[in-house]
Amino acid sequence: SHTTAFAYSSNTNIRVGGFEECEDAQIIINTAGPSIQPGNSRDRMVLLQTNVEVMRETMKKIVSYTRDAILINVSNPMDILTYIAQHEFRYPMNKIFGTGTLLDTARFNKMLADICKVDAKNVTGFVMGEHGGTCFIPWNCVNIVGIPFSEFQSQFELEEPIDKEKLLHEVKVSGLDIV
């Protein structure tokens, strides 16, 4: 799993419910909308028109019950849909989030850990920018077991040098296998 670097929380109860349950919810995770169909473009933007309408319908129902819950949007194109949910429905800015590059970061840390043969929890790196094709990795912020990436390859023998561009490409496209 790409999220193995995240801490496990055994006291979390996740369940599916109707919109009426939003009234008492502390956190709402929105995953509404269709996926990219096999044979279609692997660009998240093909989902835009359909998912904007799905987001609008979903948000109408959510805000009829609450504006107090933390709302986490996962649906794609994530950045645009989160913006629409926040601005069109005036959801409190401090309570609405898109997962952004959080999952991209988890994927990157796991993939780099696998290459370096270390536990993903020992990799610190970030994927930044917009979720999707324009994200980037600030390599000067990456460290592995506390060693800056720029020094890691010379201190530890790897089977082959790390191809930064290839790794970034894999991070970008691996999420599309889920979408």
Identify the meaning behind each predicted range.
Residues 20-22, 76-80, 130-133:
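Short, internal active-site loops enriched in acidic
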Residues 18, 98, 125-127:
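Structural signal for conserved beta-strand scaffold positions within catalytic alpha/beta enzyme cores
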